[in-house]
Each structure stands twice: as C-alpha cells, then as structure tokens.
C-alpha cells in the first residue's frame, strides 16, 4: 500500500485536503466560460440573468391552457379537414371534404392518426363528453408547441445570448397570434410548432434532429415547409462540409417517414397515395389551385402581421442589420476571415429563410392568415435580436436599456391582450353558442316531438361550425343528433357526411358522389328548413336565400343569444377598434348583433 508522507520525514500519512468545490462542477463551469456566443468572446462570458425552467414553463403553460379553452376557431378548413376526420376516427361519423375523396387524396390520414393516438385515450376516459375531449386535444397540441418554444429559447440562450432568449420567449408568450396558432389543429400550426424545434436544433448544431424535424414537417405537415430547412441544408452542405452525412441522414429519415406515411394513407384510401406530392401538384402544377377560394392583396398579410404581432413586427425587420452591426463591433479587432463570419451565418441563413417565405406566399393570389404561422418563431427571434442589439449599441450607454426594454415588452403585451380579448369578445360566441346547444341537448329530457334523428341546421354560418365534437351523439331517449346545411348566399361546395359503416376503411375508401375540386355548388347538400329542430344563426337582415329568424317568432324561438360583431358596420378608425379592444371606444364604434340558437316553437 502506497502512502503519502512529508518530504524528508517519516510522520503519519497526510489526509487529502477537504474538497470545498466539486471538481466536476468546477470543470463544467470552466468549459462553460470557454463557450463563445454570438457577441461574447471566451474571456467575456454572458453573465446576464436567465429565466428559470420553472418560470418559463409556468408562463407558457398558463397561456397555452387559456388558448385551448378560450381560443376561437377562425378557419373552416381546420374544422372540416381536420376535426371532422378525427371525429370520424373516434366516433364513426363526421363531414367529408373533396380533399379526402380517394379521387383526389390531397390530405393525409397519417396526420389525423397522429392526433388520434392521444385523442382515443381522452375519448376512453371521458366517454361521450366530447367537448372535454376536444379541449384536451387542443391542449395536447399546445403542449407540443410549448416544448418546442422552450427548446428554441434554451438554444438561443446558449448560442446567441441570454437577453435575446429572454426577449424571444416573452414575445412568444404574449403574442396574440401565438395564442390562437399554438392550439390550432391545422398543418400550418403543426409546422409552426416544429419550426421551434428546427430553430433549436439548428442553433445547437444537432443536425440529425434538425433534418428529422424538417422532413417530418414537410411530409406529414405541409410540403411547402421544406423552405424552413434552408439554413440546415446550406450550413451542412456549404459551410460545414457535411455533404455525405446530410445526404445519408436525409435519405434514411425521408424513407422512414415517407414509408410509414405512404403505408398509412394507402391503407385508408385504398390505393397508393403520397399526400404531400398530391397537394403540391394541386397547388402548383396541375390542379385548379387555391385561388378558387378567394384572392387578397399584399396588404392582407401586412394587416394580419400587425394585428397578431403589433409593435414587434416593426422591430423584426431590423433584427438582422442591428445584430450584424453589433457583431462587427464586437469582433472587429479580430482578423476578418471567413471563419469569423461563419459565426454569423445562422443569422444570415435564418433571415434569408424568413424573407423567402414571405416572398413565396406574398406573391400568391390566395392568402390566408395560417400561411404565415410557420414563420412566427422567426418573427419572435428577429424582434428579440433587434431589441437586444439596440440595447447593446446605444441604450446601455445612455443607461436606458432596462427601462425601454420593459416599456417595449409591456406595450407589446398590452396590445396583444387587447387583440386577444377583442377576438374573443367579437367572435367567441360562435363557439359558446354550440356549448349552449350541447347543454340543451344533454339536459333536456323530453324529445317526443322532435325528428329522429334530431336535426341541427346552419345556413350562412356553416363556416363557423366548431365541429361535431360540440354535437352529442345521442340524447336522453336514445335519438341520434345530426347537423345539416340549409341554403344561404354561399354558392360554393359544402362538405357532406362520410359514408356510414361499422368499418372505418370502408368509409375512407368509399368514393363519394357529388364531389368536385372546382368549388362548384352541389344542391344536394341542403335540407329543407322544415326538417330542422334547431337552427344556429347570426342575426342579420333577410336576403333572398337567408331568412331573418328574429322575424319568424311563430315558427322559431330563441333558446340562447350571445353578442356577435357586425363587421360591415364596425369600421371605426379603419377597423382598428374592431381589431383591438379599446375600453369605451370599441363599445362606442363597433356594432354588435347576436349569434342565436333557435328551436322550433312547437317543441
């Protein structure tokens, strides 16, 4: 046995000195100091104060829960192309759009099936309480987005700096656009959530995860989101020289995801289907294209971005130049070689990607709010860069960085809250009225004089139907409940009920009649008003094909009535008082009508 003795002595063995600091912890801290961030050299560590995981998670969770419960559904595509097929998977019935006809097959059942996995668990736990199942699915979507937000936030703190990460997560938390998009059941929202993961993986140089996220977003979500993989592709191929790794990883991941998707979709459609290719061909190459569903000027996106991001949208365009200015200032003493500017490459590539997305979708005639969802993470990121770089370039010298940053975020949060409340106040009743319908059908005990099945009808408000999750399967006496359409001024193609069958694949493989991809009206979709037991309508003056139920008191009586904005008469201050809630002024200048649930008077 070897002992340690004093040099030149024969005394007792020396004990090692007490360990005050754990060596592994010290080594980890040492390594941490050596990490260079965007603006921080090795000898100048980023000692800014960070948000803790707990505080970020709690803030995000509270907002995403609120969005799942109170966020409206502002896109009929979400209902009829996603909620209704999911309802079919869970309860055996729902509405079918032409996109799910095996003739066209431009939607993916694999995407629906991913949501069916947690949804089936909720349905088993809560039985026929379908609104609870609906809310829990939205919350699950929100949680998936939440984890991506935190992953991106953590990567920004590690690779850019803590202040930028802090601003980024605050913008993401308070954004009214994120409030709605984070719990929406549409592929563009799915791609938006994955963009957070892409951003985090890219900054962390986790190439395999980044490629997987881009591939999954592109193939399962929306094929156009392949654009979001531009930074990873350019960095790996042009800057890092990882060509073989990129090609092999992309092939393996693409074949795995594509294989599972093709097998799943082909099973449900009854023929070989690659849905991402079909939707690309329809929109870009051979199909009639989305312009059948309306065209908007470029100002549509400008207004939309302002409504959803208010003052942040003015800061975001300056994120790249201001960040570049401060980066150059910090590193100007170094040799300006290619390696130095490669450190700034992620900012350049992310800026190019954002600009490319805006250019592609801004140039399309058909524009929708959800088309911008996938770049929401980049908007928050570049606005955070702009605010942080402004502080570093000039405000710190004036001693005003903290004050102005707090004021900026406070102003953003107030405007976002104003926008979110305005949306709920003006349009929220189209969901709440169906909660009233659900309560009416669930609590009522006498349905003797009702039709069998009991029929709920909608006319001009067909596009605001929140899905069959709000319609009970049966009532107390066992009668089924169904929703149908009555004629309105709308002249396009409405969805039709899926085929009724005990076997799901028989339903999904069935080729429905009276379907087309030209948005041409099919009269067979309509039922006679006399066959309806309930009607949900927004009360407006009568037109040729739209009755005013308020004046039909002998036949229809209101069960519940909730305020709903009359957009055509609420144009004060160019619609700003409709877009944002301003105490007293919004109530003064906006004109409200009512969204009403009517029941036949003799029932």
Curated annotation (Swiss-Prot):
User: Could you list the residue ranges that cross the membrane?
Assistant: 109-129, 131-151, 167-187, 196-216, 219-239, 246-266, 311-331, 344-364, 371-391, 398-418
Please give the residue ranges for the topological domain Lumenal.
Answer: 1-108, 152-166, 217-218, 267-310, 365-370, 419-603
Q: Which reaction does it catalyse?
A: an alpha-D-Man-(1->2)-alpha-D-Man-(1->2)-alpha-D-Man-(1->3)-[alpha-D-Man-(1->3)-alpha-D-Man-(1->6)]-beta-D-Man-(1->4)-beta-D-GlcNAc-(1->4)-alpha-D-GlcNAc-diphospho-di-trans,poly-cis-dolichol + a di-trans,poly-cis-dolichyl beta-D-mannosyl phosphate = an alpha-D-Man-(1->2)-alpha-D-Man-(1->2)-alpha-D-Man-(1->3)-[alpha-D-Man-(1->2)-alpha-D-Man-(1->3)-alpha-D-Man-(1->6)]-beta-D-Man-(1->4)-beta-D-GlcNAc-(1->4)-alpha-D-GlcNAc-diphospho-di-trans,poly-cis-dolichol + a di-trans,poly-cis-dolichyl phosphate + H(+); an alpha-D-Man-(1->2)-alpha-D-Man-(1->2)-alpha-D-Man-(1->3)-[alpha-D-Man-(1->2)-alpha-D-Man-(1->3)-[alpha-D-Man-(1->6)]-alpha-D-Man-(1->6)]-beta-D-Man-(1->4)-beta-D-GlcNAc-(1->4)-alpha-D-GlcNAc-diphospho-di-trans,poly-cis-dolichol + a di-trans,poly-cis-dolichyl beta-D-mannosyl phosphate = an alpha-D-Man-(1->2)-alpha-D-Man-(1->2)-alpha-D-Man-(1->3)-[alpha-D-Man-(1->2)-alpha-D-Man-(1->3)-[alpha-D-Man-(1->2)-alpha-D-Man-(1->6)]-alpha-D-Man-(1->6)]-beta-D-Man-(1->4)-beta-D-GlcNAc-(1->4)-alpha-D-GlcNAc-diphospho-di-trans,poly-cis-dolichol + a di-trans,poly-cis-dolichyl phosphate + H(+)
Output one GO BP term: protein N-linked glycosylation
Localization per Swiss-Prot or TrEMBL: Endoplasmic reticulum membrane
* Residue ranges, annotated region (Disordered): 1-25
Q: In which pathway does it act?
A: Protein modification; protein glycosylation
Q: Does the keyword Translocase apply?
A: no
Keyword annotations from UniProtKB, A to Z: Endoplasmic reticulum, Glycoprotein, Glycosyltransferase, Membrane, Transferase, Transmembrane, Transmembrane helix
Task: List, in alphabetical order, the Gene Ontology terms for molecular function in this entry.
Answer: alpha-1,2-mannosyltransferase activity; dol-P-Man:Man(6)GlcNAc(2)-PP-Dol alpha-1,2-mannosyltransferase activity; dol-P-Man:Man(8)GlcNAc(2)-PP-Dol alpha-1,2-mannosyltransferase activity
Q: How does it sit in the membrane?
A: Multi-pass membrane protein
Q: Does the keyword Endoplasmic reticulum apply?
A: yes
Q: Which residues form a coiled coil?
A: none
Glycan-carrying positions = 443
GO CC terms: endoplasmic reticulum membrane
Protein function: Catalyzes the transfer of mannose from Dol-P-Man to lipid-linked oligosaccharides.
Q: Which family does it belong to?
A: Belongs to the glycosyltransferase 22 family.
Q: What is this protein called?
A: Alpha-1,2-mannosyltransferase algn-9
**Which source organism?**
Caenorhabditis elegans
Q: Which gene encodes it?
A: algn-9
